[in-house]
């Protein structure tokens, strides 16, 4: 199911954080948003999943304004992995992931065998099945991030919103997690920090600066030496491998 944001504006007091920003995700594509710290990437995601309320503009999901979408219906279709996943109550890893099934369980009914199968499959995908009975609070930051992704996968969404999903992960798990997300074959809108990983896994990239989209398109046409200088203020030499990996030499 498709997502379209058109001319979205958001301000804090007199400071404009998002300035007539437009992005879209469709056709089961992996779309990434890149840009320097403070440019509004996370703020955009929060406006999409309604933690923040935009000042103006349209956010449409599957042809319907998100303002008209009931929260439970939205939770069946849209999953979020936020940048920080600190939770103050403890439960098992399995029960934490089972929370992803909540929107699909009718009121006053219990989880089914199928729900538990979905949870186990999600834990298997992120390499955490062997820790299913562990205390969630005993996990490392990276393990908690993988559990958060498993919970999102267990929702079986058609749109996945990711805010730096590889935060706290070593490079092996960064690659594995992004490949898992890619293999879901659903619409993905991801805020990423690592430019090279974004180029490797993204079908389309938006480059943000100061609340606006400065560049957009396929990785090889968007991530250029000029764009890197304009957006990040750095000079670099950029080459591409045949399998769409960007090699960036900072100079």
For each feature predicted by the language model, list its residue ranges.
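Conserved ABC transporter NBD signature motif
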Residues: 57-65, 74
